[in-house]
Amino acid sequence: MVFTPEDRLGKQCLLLPLLLLAAWKVGSGQLHYSVPEEAKHGTFVGRIAQDLGLELAELVPRLFRMASKDREDLLEVNLQNGILFVNSRIDREELCGRSAECSIHLEVIVDRPLQVFHVDVEVRDINDNPPLFPVEEQRVLIYESRLPDSVFPLEGASDADVGSNSILTYKLSSSEYFGLDVKINSDDNKQIGLLLKKSLDREEAPAHNLFLTATDGGKPELTGTVQLLVTVLDVNDNAPTFEQSEYEVRIFENADNGTTVIRLNASDRDEGANGAISYSFNSLVAAMVIDHFSIDRNTGEIVIRGNLDFEQENLYKILIDATDKGHPPMAGHCTVLVRILDKNDNVPEIALTSLSLPVREDAQFGTVIALISVNDLDSGANGQVNCSLTPHVPFKLVSTFKNYYSLVLDSALDRESVSAYELVVTARDGGSPSLWATASLSVEVADMNDNAPAFAQPEYTVFVKENNPPGCHIFTVSARDADAQENALVSYSLVERRVGERALSSYISVHAESGKVYALQPLDHEELELLQFQVSARDAGVPPLGSNVTLQVFVLDENDNAPALLAPRVGGTGGAVSELVPRSLGAGQVVAKVRAVDADSGYNAWLSYELQPPASSARFPFRVGLYTGEISTTRVLDEADSPRHRLLVLVKDHGEPALTATATVLVSLVESGQAPKASSRASVGAAGPEAALVDVNVYLIIAICAVSSLLVLTLLLYTALRCSAPPTEGACTADKPTLVCSSAVGSWSYSQQRRQRVCSGEGPPKMDLMAFSPSLSPCPIMMGKAENQDLNEDHDAKPRQPNPDWRYSASLRAGMHSSVHLEEAGILRAGPGGPDQQWPTVSSATPEPEAGEVSPPVGAGVNSNSWTFKYGPGNPKQSGPGELPDKFIIPGSPAIISIRQEPTNSQIDKSDFITFGKKEETKKKKKKKKGNKTQEKKEKGNSTTDNSDQ
């Protein structure tokens, strides 16, 4: 059979009415249950399966289910036992509100066949809601003038329950003024009100606090409470009142205008405008009262508005009204009696006359400064006046007669300590209480020229480089004068003196106002190393006062002098030195010596010598000592050497920049028989050396004796002149001379007599002779002792090997014509803050560069005008404690003495040792080496041909 879609739709439409008809027949029955609200979960409601006639076994197969229009989760059926129970909390007020009937409608549906059952579950009300007022507190405003039995409506409470649970009864807390009025209106609701039982008085009780309680009819009873705040409103039923009906006030006659006489205070028990009080004079008050007094309407303060006078009126009677601002206004009254008291109302008067200002600081004690008069208009004790002065001042008051005083000087004045005094004169009368008056007086102290200008320190040390531009500023002196005005106006001037043959003002100028010191011309260190002078500072007072300050201007050396070659011993062409040298001369022999001097000092005068060898010669046979200038052979001369050599020696100082000079030495190689000088050098150490030196030593002895005699005569003459000459300002002191020594490492030590007189500007410079003190322990050198005197002694006093040859420099003669000064040696040490020049040192461990060459100078600047030691090769030995250092300097002469200790096995040649007036003739020894080696000789000191330079 084939069905079309239209056939299927027709059959479905026919089946639906049949099902609805069957369901209507089955569900025609209805069940009713009841359950209290707020029942717990699982509370039994009813056996719904049994009541519907269903078997428990068919509940699940027939798909037993339950539906509700309300919340479906409130009730549930247990399919195992068919019991309907409470599934969740049921709140009747939430479910049905305030409705009298409240039920839950359920539809129970089962299939096979389809059946629908209607079940109504009634929710019973329980008393679970207390009465509630709309607010926690109610405010009630009542005027105190309301009559008793007046009713004021109140807001009632409400209860969410129904039935007897919502029936409310009200109760008011106990009060003598209020009761509760309850009425039932047309809709059976209770209308409550507050009943006034007794008249109110705001001044006694401005507010009342009541409690209204509502109770429902449930079991158990539930209550609700609201607080009633009753505020009593004021009415103007009280007049202002004063504490007293009459007040008495005493006031002095000299009270100022605006002085408070009394402050009245009236009170009104009312509030607001009813209690606001204004004060005023009564209409019956006399005009005299209004002229002398006034009253503040708001505060009730009575003040003085006119001058009171005890002699005119001593009592005032004032009527006062206090009125509130109520309706109608009410007033209170009082009387104020003002009694005027007599008073010491006249302050002493002070008059200053005959002022003698300012006061000289040298004024005598008792000098009258001012006259003071006092006056008091009062009489009796009120008119008796005493005067006093500011304490701790050098003045006092002296009473001349009644009410007249003199201000006089009581102690010495010092304007520099206190330039002005502010005095306060106090006049006090004898009243009770007493009155006083003060007068200020400014006393200035006139300055007197009692303070000389003072410098910060008595001596200044200034360092100026030589060759300064003319007029350059070198220093500024400043003196302070404690005085004032013209007495403190300081002017500066130079204390004139002679500097050698010239006036000090030709060197130095001082600006009179600023104190700036200027060098008027370039200073020359070689001419003037120290310029010591004084600057005077004087004020403009009458008479003027002054003081001096000493300035020590040290002229610092600059390298402005190039080395100068000394005149050659034998004239040659073009200024060159010609030397004849035998070809048989061995290696290391001195053939010539270049001598040069440098007028500078320190490093600027430290000379070094360099030989410029020709470019064509690979084995040049000559060399020059770096610091000695001695030209010696480097090897044995042979026939291959050129017969003539032109040697160019470059002499250079150590300044910045270095300055140089060039010396030319012409060396001619000749046979031994053709050169006497060369043969004499070559014959040193031959069979008869003593015979070759006999004639030379004779001349040396004669020359030394002559020089010694001249020295003794000079010393005697100088001593006589110094003893007979009167002392002059700035003369040199006769302190012990200073011997300056260098230690083994080149440091300098000085004797206790640190400074000698530096005669810069004290007569002709460099004219004093300095003797060397032999008592100085650091430098145990004894001049003028006998032969074989050991110059170097150690702590054990063991004899040491004699010194090598001493050679008397040819240029020392120039130094003998001048005095020996510390400043000439370049080692001057000034006073506080003065210079301390230290020169480069050479360690005793430094290996010597070549034979016969003097090591670099240790100490001051060096030139050939010096004592010179000549020695053979070998390293210097460091001296032990108490021994004489390797090098020392004779102060006052640009000289260096080098003492070298030869090795034990070294060959030593000895020459003459020249001292001041004594001579030790040493012998020369010769040692020959085996083989065909050339015999080497080491010469200490100058050759005998050099004695002519002495």
From Swiss-Prot:
The gene is PCDHA6. Glycans are attached at N257, N265, N386, N548. Residues 1-29 form the signal peptide. Residues 909-923 have a biased composition (Basic and acidic residues). Disulfide bonds: none annotated. SMART domains: CA (SM00112). This is Protocadherin alpha-6. Residues 719-950 are cytoplasmic. The lineage of its organism: Eukaryota, Metazoa, Chordata, Craniata, Vertebrata. CDD domains: Cadherin_repeat. The chain crosses the membrane at residues 698-718.
